[in-house]
Amino acid sequence: MSLLQFSGLFIVWLLATLFIGTLTWFEFRRVRFNFNVFFSLLFLLTFFFGFPLTSILVFRFNVAVVPAEVLLQALLSAGCFYAVYYVTYKTRLRTARAQAASSGGGLFTMNRVETHLAWMVMMAVALVSVGIFFMHNGFLLFRLHSYSQIFSSEVSGVALKRFFYFFIPAMLVVYFLRQSSRAWLFFLVSTVGFGLLTYMIVGGTRANIIIAFAIFLFIGIIRGWISPGMLAAAGVMGIVGMFWLALKRYGLNVSGDEAFYTFLYLTRDTFSPWENLALLLQHYGDIEFQGLAPIARDFYVFIPSWVWPDRPHIVLNTANYFTWEVLNNHSGLAISPTLLGSLVVMGGVWFIPPGAVVVGLIIKWFDWLYERGNHEPNRYKAAILHSFCFGAIFNMIVLAREGLDAFVSRVIFFMVVFGACLVVAKLIYWLLDSAGLIQPRRRRAAPLSPTETL
């Protein structure tokens, strides 16, 4: 990449970043938080944060990258995608009166006991899954020699990892029932502690830690306990923390220029794998478009082999197609194609505009559900709605990094398990109530004041 090419790319990157950043800032000033703000920040992080890191790698360490014209196509594709997404998100599908008329009632309600039972069931799902996985494998972080081994046949019970995450929605219910600064700090300590435990047991998976910390920060923004400046500082600390965990995961011991180089490429690959989109565009002529099949194939991993004995052992979703067919990488790891990359694999660049419309509608639905929780008079139902919305933040990160096919399968799995936990909680409540074990809460007598006597 020449200096002239870099200058052109920098101008496009700066304009696109200012465009998305300005819209996001106005939305933040208007509502402080919604899922459009979150997705916009996530989109900026995924497709634009990595450009400065790539530039330093090129000019400081002479790292080879794809041609500048392909990088330009990647930046323009991301900018155009966001423009279509934003118009879709801002398009009102119904009148305000119709939206208000549909905001009452609802199909379900929650009482105090059912809500507490719900978070206990979700926590039990997570803890039992972790316990069974640990009994089969021990602490994989200290047993395995490379991170790719966690996907090998040496590790059993891999499907259980999908249930670990439900510890976070459980703690979200606990927080939203109280919404105090003490409950907020308890959420951080409990979820990050659980994330560190799963990091050691699974052998280096950092997702639970990242998600817990991100939710903690956004709750702080909503409540006014964290300023945007504090959020930026916490983000820097988070990046450094994730780099340290990555070093431990891969067993790297680096210093000096090597440490700086390692920090740049690990941070880029962790937070902003935008070059993967450029790689797909570079090999565009070699891609056999997969259509919508990757969305269906991604559900295969949730089907037990005893239910489907002939289930394919290799799932050709967009991430695996990108890893095996484009990169010719058969190390056992699946490399993230990004949201736009998954659309390119499925249908080429013509899938990007309709994909942006679909994503806009998805984020619009989550914001509608979030607003329902904000205006819900039943605090227990509101806690469940907010727990569901914030718990789905992980799936939105999957959407931006892994692609639309991975998002669809994971969000449906999350909805099914979350809903099943609510059904189990209601069933337990019904059994307890039928046995006469549920008693109405008695109002406590007001304590005597120091001047009152019996």
Swiss-Prot record:
It is found in: Cell inner membrane. It is a multi-pass membrane protein. Pathway: Bacterial outer membrane biogenesis; enterobacterial common antigen biosynthesis. The chain crosses the membrane at residues 6-26, 37-57, 63-83, 122-142, 157-177, 183-203, 209-229, 230-250, 343-363, 380-400, 411-431. GO terms for biological process: enterobacterial common antigen biosynthetic process. One of its GO terms (cellular component) is plasma membrane. It comes from the Bacteria. Its main location: membrane. Belongs to the WzyE family. Probably part of a complex composed of WzxE, WzyE and WzzE. This is Probable ECA polymerase. It comes from Cronobacter sakazakii (strain ATCC BAA-894) (Enterobacter sakazakii). The lineage of its organism: Bacteria, Pseudomonadati, Pseudomonadota, Gammaproteobacteria, Enterobacterales. The gene is wzyE.
